[in-house]
């Protein structure tokens, strides 16, 4: 008779009767079979239970969708590139990435990749040649915000290996196709989300790529919302994680400061030697965050520190390329504008004392102007920033913006405010002189910095041209700088950016910018918007003018009946408000549709100049 098996193996008779099977003390069968005098045979195995499936319809539907997505990704990555230049397949690898050939598919392995991003239909000839895109960015674009140095000998393959995310962002900003910009936007943001949220990465590659994307992606226009503030805030967070803005404090009390655990060779690390690349990146992050925060008002600028002051001094003293000296001047000027904003904010809702406020900042601005290196004193990007900061200081001291129903527009603003507004007008006029001598093609290379310069200049000029204060001479504003002429020149500059005039409307980003310019011009020329003054009669303001530092200053004004009507103050140019663009006939979320009618285009989509 066989012995008992392991737990759960009853003999055949006990198993059939579904009773407890207890072995005999001598191991010869079980007690039940011995009592019933039956042969005791062990069973041969455990009866397998039938598995129960509780698959909900929702899970089955999700599994089906996941299978379709995986099959789509596999089909995209396994298909060869087209002969006319299919975009390279870019991937983020745990090992060193490699630039794929335009005529061969990228060698991609799921096992060796940290994550893979599916490429969009990026077939524009402007970016298929990565070397050409890199050279154009280095030679034509980077000078408008020089927080990055790309040596002349640096190739696209080397840049992709050393700075893969920066490489992708450069390619993304160098295309003019609206659809490709949107495709790149999804890829870049997917990379940002995975790297910073899922993988908790912080490195110089991410920081530089974020700054490039913030400066040149035009994402705020494509998405019709101020998304750049979040991108810049992410860049600031990378700076904080890397301690680029300041070293760890000496009283740091994290648990890791106690020692290296079981490692006998652990020693506390000393201060890290900062590279020039890191110094440029942190200074560029401050520059971009400060000027974007002053435009969108949805974030605070990066705080200035002593470490950044040292970086600024060392970069200006030992520049590796001309952009280092230019970056130092840009940062100095923007720091002055930021300090003016901080001083204004400290007063809260109370108005600042205009003469005292302007005295110190004008002195500092003049000191920076005199310290500009000789080879940069005629640089248009530097001069544009100089006049922008001058305008910012005077607008901070006293703004020409009038909020409807909040103040009595019949009250005079006083000579100090008039003087401040007049200097704002002179700063805009100086900026306009610089702008008019820039070639129209520079618009395609501008960073967000230059676009903010233009926006503040035209918005403030509009407010000065329609300010209702009785002691402010709108006739003199119109004679000094005609806002209609300014917009006419802007529109003429954009006209030269449109490819194939008179043909079908192209999928070109700057063609849409041309449409926006025409829409604004149409809005400005609407009946009742602006009324030119009578320029034949001499103004009382011109008779009481005085001189200040060689410039004409008009401190007081006793006007006749105003010739320039201020009715549209409540409709002031609100470039930061998406609803304002919708009012021009631009539907939200679509940078193409709806603009034709607002710009005066033919319904067939033909461009008529």
From Swiss-Prot:
Annotated DNA-binding ranges? 11-40
Instruction: List the InterPro entries hit by this protein, alphabetically.
Output: prtT (IPR051089), Zn2-C6_fun-type_DNA-bd_sf (IPR036864), Zn2Cys6_DnaBD (IPR001138)
- Bias (Polar residues) occurs at 97-114
* CDD domains hit by this protein: fungal_TF_MHR, GAL4
One MF term in the entry's GO annotations:
DNA-binding transcription factor activity, RNA polymerase II-specific
Q: Which GO terms describe its cellular component?
A: nucleus
Could you give a single Gene Ontology term from the biological process aspect?
Answer: regulation of DNA-templated transcription
Task: Reply yes or no: does the keyword Zinc apply.
Answer: yes
State what protein this is by name: Transcription factor AN6788
Query: What this chain does, per the record?
Result: Transcription factors AN6788 and AN6790 act in tandem to regulate the expression of the non-reducing polyketide synthase pkfA from the aspernidine A biosynthesis cluster. They do not control the expression of the other genes involved in aspernidine A biosynthesis, nor do they regulate the expression of the highly reducing polyketide synthase AN6791 and the esterase AN6793 with which they are predicted to form a secondary metabolite biosynthesis cluster.
What are the entry keywords?
DNA-binding, Metal-binding, Nucleus, Transcription, Transcription regulation, Zinc
Where do the segments described as Disordered lie? Answer: 82-118
List locations, semicolon-separated: Nucleus
Annotated PANTHER family: FINGER DOMAIN PROTEIN, PUTATIVE-RELATED, ZN(II)2CYS6 TRANSCRIPTION FACTOR (EUROFUNG)
Do the record's keywords include Flavoprotein? no
Give the highest taxon in the source lineage: Eukaryota
């Amino acid at each position: 008779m066989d012995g008992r098996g392991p737990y759960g193996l009853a003999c055949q008779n006990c198993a059939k009767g579904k009773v407890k099977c207890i072995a005999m003390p001598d191991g010869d069968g079980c007690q039940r079979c011995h009592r019933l005098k039956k042969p005791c045979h062990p069973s041969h195995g455990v009866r397998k239970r039938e598995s129960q499936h509780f698959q909900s319809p929702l899970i089955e539907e999700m599994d089906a969708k996941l299978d379709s997505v995986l099959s789509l990704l596999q089909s995209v990555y396994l298909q060869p590139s087209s002969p006319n230049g299919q975009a390279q397949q870019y991937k983020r690898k745990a090992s060193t990435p490699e630039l794929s050939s335009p005529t061969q598919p990228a060698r991609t392995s799921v096992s060796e990749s940290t994550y893979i991003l599916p490429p969009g239909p990026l077939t524009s000839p402007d970016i298929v040649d990565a070397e050409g895109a890199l050279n154009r960015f280095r030679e034509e674009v980077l000078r408008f915000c020089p927080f990055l140095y790309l040596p002349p000998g640096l190739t696209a393959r080397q840049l992709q290996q050393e700075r893969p995310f920066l490489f992708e962002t450069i390619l993304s900003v160098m295309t003019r196709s609206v659809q490709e910009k949107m495709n790149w936007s999804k890829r870049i943001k997917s990379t940002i989300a995975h790297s910073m949220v899922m993988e908790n990465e912080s490195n110089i590659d991410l920081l530089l790529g974020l700054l490039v994307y913030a400066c040149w992606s035009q994402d705020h226009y494509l998405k019709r919302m101020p998304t750049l503030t979040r991108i810049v805030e992410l860049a600031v967070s990378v700076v904080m994680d890397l301690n680029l803005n300041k070293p760890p404090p000496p009283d740091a009390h994290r648990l890791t400061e106690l020692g290296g655990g079981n490692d006998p060779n652990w020693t506390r690390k000393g201060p890290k030697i900062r590279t020039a690349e890191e110094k440029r990146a942190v200074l560029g992050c401050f520059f971009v965050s400060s000027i974007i925060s002053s435009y969108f008002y949805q974030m605070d600028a990066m705080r200035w520190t002593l470490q950044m002051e040292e970086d600024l001094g060392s970069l200006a003293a030992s520049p590796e390329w001309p952009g280092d000296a230019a970056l130092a001047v840009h940062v100095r000027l923007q720091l002055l504008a930021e300090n003016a904003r901080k001083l204004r904010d400290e007063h809260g809702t109370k108005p600042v004392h205009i003469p005292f406020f302007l005295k110190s900042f004008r002195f500092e601005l003049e000191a920076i102007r005199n310290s500009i290196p000789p080879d940069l004193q005629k640089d248009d990007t530097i001069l544009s920033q100089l006049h922008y900061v001058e305008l910012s200081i005077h607008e901070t001291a006293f703004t020409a913006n009038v909020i409807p129903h909040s103040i009595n527009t019949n009250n005079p603003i006083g000579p100090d405010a008039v003087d401040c507004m007049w200097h704002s007008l002179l700063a805009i006029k100086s900026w306009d002189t610089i702008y008019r001598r820039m070639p129209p093609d520079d618009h395609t290379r501008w960073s967000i910095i230059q676009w903010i310069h233009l926006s503040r200049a035209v918005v403030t000029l509009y407010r000065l041209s329609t300010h209702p204060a009785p002691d402010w001479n709108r006739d003199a504003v119109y004679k000094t700088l005609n806002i209609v002429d300014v917009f006419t020149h802007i529109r003429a500059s954009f006209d030269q950016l449109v490819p194939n005039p008179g043909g079908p409307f192209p999928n070109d980003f700057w063609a849409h910018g041309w449409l926006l310019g025409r829409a604004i011009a149409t809005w400005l020329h609407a009946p009742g918007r602006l009324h030119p003054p009578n320029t034949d009669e001499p103004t009382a303001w011109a008779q009481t003018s005085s001189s200040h530092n060689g410039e004409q200053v008009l401190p007081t004004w006793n006007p006749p009946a105003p010739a320039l009507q201020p009715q549209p103050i409540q409709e002031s140019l609100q470039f930061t408000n998406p609803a304002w663009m919708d009012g021009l006939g631009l539907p939200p979320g679509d940078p193409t549709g709806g603009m034709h009618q607002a710009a005066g285009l033919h319904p067939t989509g033909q461009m008529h100049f």
